[in-house]
């Protein structure tokens, strides 16, 4: 929070100059000198749009349309400085309050200002004491989104040093406390009914996090969330010195996928309660590119759910009995497990296992960034009307319209068995031999073989 104090002191110092200036004199004449002084204090180029001083009902200085930084990456609509009038005649000058309205800044800009040493550390005489600072309608500006608006109350010690700050979103759903710690700032945040302001609009029933923020990184060792009927506990680190780097891990338990899955992966249609242990990392030049650069890996298990848009059991039973399969339907399961690798918007599901009553299936499926499917599922149906056989199904189509078709080897084996031994038993024996030989001689994909065990 050093940058807030520096900003307040910079404008507060101007009041000492303005005491001797008649209030009817246009203050725009003094803008170049004022901009120069504030720039020197902040260590950033500063541009001011307008100044106005008033005596009644209390002496105040209003500064409007402020830009700081070479690219204007700090912007303020208005700053109102209210001094202790009589202190302006002596030293130090006391500023009762500084109100900053409509602040917009990038993380990098705030990091630059926060890294500046306060005047006392640089051996300068402290000529201005600020008693309180308040922000309204502030926003943290990202490349394609903004965090906020939020309000903040900043408490200062008797010597003007930063003591603590409380930040609240305009709707009151998120509250954060900040105070100095370990050469940076300790951050503790709490939220209820809060929606992510950037990225997928995930809604948190409850969110609590604790961590330490520095000028170029923030590390959160405790993250606890309740969402979609389950909970997530984890840790994360965000760095922004050269580009944006995000890393972390989490434990996910009992999260219902029906509403959450489409928010994370477009067109994903699945329900059930998820258990997972993801480890993730992303590095990008800009924050907006993080999603595309994300790499996530996790074992997973989904209980009591449904895969919508495809009926694996029906496809396997119809093909096994030599009937034509039609697309669509759904696959209910007691348990779906496997291993997921997400990398640059492509999903690889390996070590897949599906269990549900008469259905047992395993295999691997990949989803391209364009939502195209590829892979193979081996399905086995236990039914009185059909002799049990494992049916290998090639997976194709898209996430919206998946297609399951028997492999060429399975079709050929089933046809040969039928020709030699007749339909029914002959078909099953021929198909089984073909499937077994296929698995023995290269039937599994390389990615399925190399996937780590759970």
Predicted regions and their residues:
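Glycine-rich, small/hydroxylated-residue low-complexity segments
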Residues: 51, 61, 83, 93-95, ...
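Flexible beta-edge/linker motif
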Residues: 52-112, 122-140, 163-165, 288-290
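N-terminal amphipathic/hydrophobic interface segments
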Residues: 5-66, 71
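Short, hydrophobic/aromatic-rich segments at coil-to-beta transitions
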Residues: 60-62, 131-134, 159-166, 184-188, ...
């Amino acid at each position: 929070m050093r940058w807030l104090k520096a900003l307040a002191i910079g404008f507060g110092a101007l009041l000492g100059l303005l005491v001797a200036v008649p209030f009817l004199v246009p203050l725009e004449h003094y803008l170049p000198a004022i901009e120069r002084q504030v720039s020197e204090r902040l260590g950033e180029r500063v541009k001011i749009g307008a100044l106005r001083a008033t005596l009644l009902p209390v002496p105040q200085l209003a500064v409007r349309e402020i830009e700081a930084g070479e690219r204007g990456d700090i912007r303020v609509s208005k700053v109102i400085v209210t001094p202790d009038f009589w202190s302006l005649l002596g030293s130090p000058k006391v500023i009762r309050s500084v109100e900053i309205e409509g602040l917009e800044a990038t993380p990098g800009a705030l990091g630059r200002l926060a890294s500046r040493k306060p005047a006392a550390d640089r051996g300068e005489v402290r000529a201005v004491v600020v008693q309180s600072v308040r922000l309204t309608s502030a926003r943290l500006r990202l490349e394609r989104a903004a965090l906020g608006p939020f309000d903040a109350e900043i408490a200062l010690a008797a010597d003007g040093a930063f003591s603590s700050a409380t930040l609240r979103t305009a709707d009151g759903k998120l509250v954060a406390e900040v105070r100095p710690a370990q050469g940076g700032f300790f951050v503790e945040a709490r939220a209820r009914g809060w929606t992510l302001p950037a990225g997928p609009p995930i809604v948190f029933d409850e969110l609590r996090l604790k961590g330490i923020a520095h000028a170029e990184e923030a590390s959160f060792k405790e993250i606890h969330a309740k969402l979609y009927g389950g909970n997530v506990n984890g840790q994360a680190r965000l760095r922004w010195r050269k580009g944006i780097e995000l890393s972390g891990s989490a434990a996910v338990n009992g999260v219902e996928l029906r509403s959450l899955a489409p928010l994370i992966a477009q067109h994903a249609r699945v329900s059930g309660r998820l258990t997972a242990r993801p480890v993730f990392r992303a590095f990008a030049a800009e924050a907006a590119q993080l999603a595309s650069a994300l790499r996530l890996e996790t074992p997973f298990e989904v209980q009591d759910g449904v895969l919508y848009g495809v009926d694996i059991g029906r496809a396997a039973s119809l093909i096994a009995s030599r009937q034509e399969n039609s697309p669509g339907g759904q696959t209910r399961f007691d348990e779906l497990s496997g291993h997921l690798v997400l990398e640059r918007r492509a999903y690889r599901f390996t070590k897949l296992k599906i269990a549900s009553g008469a259905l047992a299936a395993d295999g691997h499926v990949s989803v391209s960034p364009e939502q195209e499917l590829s892979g193979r599922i081996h399905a086995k149906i236990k039914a009185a009307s059909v002799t049990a056989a494992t049916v290998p199904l090639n997976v194709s189509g898209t996430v919206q319209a998946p297609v399951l078709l028997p492999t060429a080897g399975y079709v050929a084996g089933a046809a040969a068995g039928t020709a030699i031994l007749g339909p029914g038993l002959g078909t099953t024996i021929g198909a089984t031999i073909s499937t077994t030989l296929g698995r023995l001689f290269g039937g599994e994909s390389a990615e399925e073989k190399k996937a780590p065990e759970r």
